[in-house]
């Protein structure tokens, strides 16, 4: 039994280290994947739009989309537009952001988290008045699949749109679940009074996350100094620049991993030395 104590101590320490590191790494990966799922790895928008969802447009034509797709690390490119507004029911109201996407939108993330209904192929040339809403918003407003909701948007005047819920998703990432509804790009552009080739921005998915910073700077170097035909300047930012607080918090978890590793190595070393002393004595 005494001979087995050092081995058991080391084995226990290794098991705890592996479990702790796996849990933290898995958690970080899950959070990162959900942030990327809502907004891709890199976004190109209007430099003057800051970080508001009430964005100023940039012109993104087919030639720019093709040029962005030619970067080796870029896997997918998609246009989007956003419009802050409010949902009002008979008993409650809730602020939200309506995000418009088109046929090119990669809906894999939302299909993976879809609870009810469908995620339709939205359009940039017509409005179907369909919307996909989160489970948390549906619960707050007592809405269900197939319901029609009244949405209101403030421009120079108040605009109202009645939209039909065709899908309900749940990512359990409340910061975004409580915010985003998805619909046709065409509808959001109409609400913003924009031209057909004007959008809030472009989302880019990349092949290798480890090359995020390198790819961001490469695209920014080619894009930032080339304004569109209205003089709007492009701004390239990646997911870590758009969400600094969340990624700073995730970075702190790396410190926790090292603390756990050091403690477990210390415990394993102490156990091994103690076991050897017991055997010798």
Where are these regions (language model features)?
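Membrane-interface junction motifs in transport/secretion proteins
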Residues: 28-62
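A short beta-strand structural signal in non-transmembrane regions
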Residues: 42, 138, 197-220, 235
